[in-house]
């Protein structure tokens, strides 16, 4: 006699479980997670991304028969639900998603316990109502279930469909956000495009890779690096050593700034009139016109990383995302331990971007003023976040109340791709290159220059200018090689590979209290900032592992390596396997005498720096001048301006 049709078969129970977990995931996307979903494509991706892993995991249990199949599907569904809800609770408290590295930090686990009790919402039953119903059926209504096995020959079809759905999801995601998995900008981006379950798998794979690399490392590897970097160390310049002891340090990041803008006019108007003044040598600032960015795929995050650690970023991906839980001996922590500085970062975007909320803890940064500390009303936002003028104004107000001496890093945003600006903020006409990116870049750079001038004026009014080291720099290029045709129109010259390397100058301006300004033509890069600042405040650098050299030192190394292995010196540049003269950018027919030595040094620098990151070698370093940072003691709470926008 056949069983009644109303009974629930194993495959039907599987589909029901997949469907209800997916519904709960959608619910979390729109109610609990702030993912910044925009447009039709991103909403379609959001609809698609939970299915693949849920179905793949639960389909394994279709191989079982009878009661076992139902119970295994139920348990698998419960574990996925638990993972989802754990992320919901964690996100409510930390505005981020759970990772294996955060779970391994005792401080985070303890905070999580408090977060659960503090973060319950009245609607949380939604996450478990299906679990309760299924459990009741399995215990009390077993007669509703059809225990006949699901045909095993169809299980691989279900699995293959799940895998195909994942790759379709990934294709859509890569179309909307290229290099999603290689650059890993932000956990929110990964969850938005892949879903929380695939994100957990991705994080697990990366954690295993990192742990394997660390497991192979030893103190011997550290010794090799220390011996190498000690040979590179340069003696400080007595004229500058200790000149800024216990002075505030204000580090200003000019987003996507390139120095071809200095003294550049468009339609008869200066693009950067304020920076032009600072570059003249007649102001309080020393200008380094031959200062280059040294970033890789991590762009802005690489710039921050390099300048605070004197290490190179990774050859692929971002060190912030992939090596964020390493041990470091960073500039903020050294300043704190040696001279009692408090440190902070100020940024008009949310704290999870580039994994900053985790990385900064390992750098020993005390406070993080993210978007929740600023007025993020629509009038104040453009492109990726807060406009530079309101950002600088609010930041100066915060700085005027800070304990001194402080180390404060301000990260601007308006001069960021795609370089769009509200009409009321545009005060210079665009050029007419026919390329909206290049044309817009002129307007946003002009706005940035105005905002910077207003900020410096504010510092003077608040009594912070005279007693502060002020450092201004561009983080990376803004205009890529894809826009060479438009750049040729703008600059009136051909953009060759050699010329494009010249355009990687991003500028460095430094004001040291009590010192007159000028123009310093040394060739330098972001790697050199940390040793320079340590010497300026009078901290001996001999026991710190750094790859850069003091820019004021008479022994300063004028070879500037790039992350891809290219490099530039005072006389020539090595680009894509070819050597060009700096005078005219023409190919050299003979190798310079010091070329092989310099090339070998660049390769060794990159190799050694990579070994520090991949092996997490600082964990082995018993530095008499440094106490290891405990990331668990740092917590970056949201500011008074409220929660993140949905």
From Swiss-Prot:
Example of a GO biological process term: lipoteichoic acid biosynthetic process
Membrane topology: Multi-pass membrane protein
Record has S-adenosyl-L-methionine as a keyword: no
Compartment(s) of residence: Cell membrane
Entries under SUPFAM superfamilies matching the protein: Alkaline phosphatase-like (SSF53649)
Active site residues of this protein: 300
Cited function: Catalyzes the polymerization of lipoteichoic acid (LTA) polyglycerol phosphate, a reaction that presumably uses phosphatidylglycerol (PG) as substrate. Is required for staphylococcal growth and cell division process.
Protein name per the record: Lipoteichoic acid synthase
Gene that encodes it: ltaS
């Amino acid at each position: 006699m056949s069983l009644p049709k109303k009974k629930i078969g194993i495959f039907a129970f599987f589909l029901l479980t997949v469907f209800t977990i997916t519904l709960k995931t959608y619910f979390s996307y729109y109610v609990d997670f702030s993912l910044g979903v925009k447009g039709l494509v991103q909403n379609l991706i959001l609809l698609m991304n939970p299915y693949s892993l849920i179905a793949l995991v639960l389909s394994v249990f279709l191989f079982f028969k009878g009661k076992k199949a139902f119970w295994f599907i139920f348990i698998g569904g419960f574990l996925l639900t638990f993972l989802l809800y754990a992320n919901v609770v964690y996100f409510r408290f930390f505005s981020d998603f759970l990772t294996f590295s955060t779970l391994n930090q005792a401080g985070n686990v303890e905070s999580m316990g408090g977060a659960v009790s503090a973060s319950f919402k009245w609607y949380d039953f939604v996450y478990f109502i299906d679990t309760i119903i299924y459990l009741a059926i399995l215990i009390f209504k077993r007669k509703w279930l059809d225990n006949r096995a699901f045909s095993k020959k169809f299980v691989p079809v279900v699995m293959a469909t799940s895998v195909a759905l994942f790759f379709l999801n990934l294709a859509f995601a890569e179309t909307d956000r290229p290099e999603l998995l290689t650059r890993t900008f932000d956990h929110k981006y990964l969850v938005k495009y892949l879903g929380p379950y695939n994100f957990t798998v991705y994080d697990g794979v990366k954690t295993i890779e990192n742990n394997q690399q660390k497991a192979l490392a030893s103190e011997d590897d550290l010794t090799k690096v220390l011996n190498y970097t000690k040979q590179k160390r340069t003696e400080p310049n007595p004229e500058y050593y200790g000149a800024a002891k216990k002075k505030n340090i204000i580090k200003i990041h000019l987003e996507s700034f390139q120095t071809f803008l200095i003294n550049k006019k468009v339609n008869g108007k200066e693009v950067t009139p304020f920076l032009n003044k600072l570059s003249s040598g007649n102001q309080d600032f020393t200008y380094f016109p031959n200062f280059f960015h040294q970033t890789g795929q991590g762009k802005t995050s690489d710039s921050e990383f390099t300048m605070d650690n004197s290490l190179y970023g990774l050859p692929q991906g971002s060190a912030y995302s992939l090596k964020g839980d390493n041990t470091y001996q960073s500039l903020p922590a050294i300043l704190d331990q040696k001279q009692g500085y408090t440190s902070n970062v100020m940024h008009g975007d949310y704290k999870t971007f580039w994994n900053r909320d985790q990385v900064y803890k390992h750098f020993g940064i005390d406070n993080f003023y993210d978007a929740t500390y600023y007025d993020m009303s629509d009038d104040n936002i453009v492109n990726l976040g807060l406009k530079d003028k309101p950002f600088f104004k609010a930041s100066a107000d915060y700085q005027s109340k800070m304990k001194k001496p402080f180390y404060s890093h301000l990260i601007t945003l308006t001069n960021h791709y795609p370089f769009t600006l509200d009409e009321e903020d545009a005060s210079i006409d665009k050029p007419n290159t026919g390329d909206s990116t290049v044309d817009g870049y002129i307007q946003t750079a002009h706005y940035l220059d105005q905002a910077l001038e207003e900020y410096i004026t504010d510092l003077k009014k608040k009594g912070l200018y005279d007693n502060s080291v002020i450092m201004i720099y561009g983080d990376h290029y803004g205009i890529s090689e894809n826009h060479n045709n438009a750049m040729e129109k703008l600059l009136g010259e051909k953009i060759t590979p050699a010329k494009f390397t010249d355009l990687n100058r991003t500028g460095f301006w430094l004001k040291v209290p009590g010192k007159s300004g000028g123009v310093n033509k040394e060739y330098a890069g972001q790697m050199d900032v940390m040793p320079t600042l340590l010497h300026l405040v009078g901290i001996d650098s001999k026991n710190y592992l750094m790859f850069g050299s003091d820019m004021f030192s008479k022994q300063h190394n004028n070879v500037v390596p790039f992350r891809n292995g290219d490099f530039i010196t005072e006389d020539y540049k090595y680009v894509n396997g070819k050597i060009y003269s700096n005078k005219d950018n023409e190919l050299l027919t003979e190798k310079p005498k010091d070329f092989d030595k310099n090339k070998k040094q660049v390769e060794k620098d990159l190799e050694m720096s990579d070994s520090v990151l991949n092996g997490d070698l600082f964990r082995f370093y018993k530095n008499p001048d440094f106490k290891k940072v405990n990331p668990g003691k740092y917590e970056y709470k949201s500011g008074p301006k409220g929660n993140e926008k949905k």
